Amino acid sequence: MDSQGRKVIVVDNGTGFVKCGYAGTNFPAHIFPSMVGRPIVRSTQRVGNIEIKDLMVGEECSQLRQMLDINYPMDNGIVRNWDDMAHVWDHTFGPEKLDIDPKECKLLLTEPPLNPNSNREKMFQVMFEQYGFNSIYVAVQAVLTLYAQGLLTGVVVDSGDGVTHICPVYEGFALHHLTRRLDIAGRDITKYLIKLLLQRGYNFNHSADFETVRQMKEKLCYIAYDVEQEERLALETTVLSQQYTLPDGRVIRLGGERFEAPEILFQPHLINVEKAGLSELLFGCIQASDIDTRLDFYKHIVLSGGTTMYPGLPSRLEKELKQLYLDRVLHGNTDAFQKFKIRIEAPPSRKHMVFLGGAVLANLMKDRDQDFWVSKKEYEEGGIARCMAKLGIKA
């Protein structure tokens, strides 16, 4: 709470999951799927202890996904369906989760780098006009990730469910002109794994199966350090073969699919996306920065988001970055290469790094009403332009 007794709330709206809680805490109070479902056929009132309602949000929606028409309000990190997003926020602030009176609360929201102005403006409008929050602050996710690591300068590689961003931050400011975006993330890896399993004769094309394959992916997939070697192992041996028990009791075996699915992060052409992979984008991003900041950036690369949790990802990224630097900057000069230092930080809590940074920042700033929080009064008097100006954003 701030000095006036108002609760300070932090909400990290991800494409796949909402993480919400309070300033000063080191873990979200609630994590739930950012999905909305409506019954396909109203044939029954209850399933187990869950009542089937006309509108289901979050965990209940995920558990009953076989019976529902599922909609994800966010896509690639950006809100596409505001009506359904409002249902997700009703769930967040209502008795099911935080159970707050917005008029007595300050709210810190997170946004992806390169968030369109129209998206941010609509978010302010909804939070002030529909919910009536006392005051609001919007922070860029990459900056919050660095705060959670105790850093002000570094490059954040943030890959969640809907989008991957590489965002350099200098002295606490996100450098948007250098930010790289890749529209490949967790959801695309799940879709590609479904396709690979289909080629093996396993059919997972129902929307309900999507969650099953997502859980399978999180349990079994990894990033190959050496793709050719893994391909040989998959072809010639059964070393990579692991079994997975489906919810209905059937058992399936996964082999090469375990590394082939997440490989699209490094080789987007596998799913017909003509973009550079993760290592190329990261290298290009750092090399495009000021020559004085490059060494700092190479020494402070921070991974964030659930899709960076794959075993093997930090070492593969480091290997490819070093190779790119040796080939393109040093032109094969191995003596100079000995002095090149690179450090990739992969904190164990990186799935929730954005929330943690938000909780730290909101706690530090909870009483800085004049120069930090945008109040409802300021919004009503000066409109969206005043809000953007206070946040230091050109409207």
Curated annotation (Swiss-Prot):
Keywords: Actin-binding, ATP-binding, Cytoplasm, Cytoskeleton, Nucleotide-binding
Positions contributing to ATP binding: 160-162, 214-218, 305-310
SUPFAM superfamilies, A to Z: Actin-like ATPase domain (SSF53067)
Localization per Swiss-Prot or TrEMBL: Cytoplasm, Cytoskeleton
PROSITE patterns: ACTINS_2, ACTINS_ACT_LIKE
Domain of life: Eukaryota
Molecular function terms from GO: actin binding; ATP binding
GO CC annotations, alphabetized: Arp2/3 protein complex; cell cortex
Gene knockout outcome: RNAi-mediated knockdown suppresses the memory retention defects of the msi-1 os1 loss of function mutant.
GO biological process assignments: Arp2/3 complex-mediated actin nucleation; epithelial cell migration; gastrulation; morphogenesis of embryonic epithelium
Annotated function: Functions as ATP-binding component of the Arp2/3 complex which is involved in regulation of actin polymerization and together with an activating nucleation-promoting factor (NPF) mediates the formation of branched actin networks. Seems to contact the pointed end of the daughter actin filament. Plays a role in time-dependent memory loss and the retention of conditioned behavior over time.
Family per record: Belongs to the actin family. ARP2 subfamily.
Quaternary structure note: Component of the Arp2/3 complex, at least composed of arx-1, arx-2, arx-4 and arx-6.
Protein name as it appears in the record: Actin-related protein 2
Organism encoding this protein: Caenorhabditis elegans
Taxon lineage: Eukaryota, Metazoa, Ecdysozoa, Nematoda, Chromadorea
Gene name as annotated: arx-2
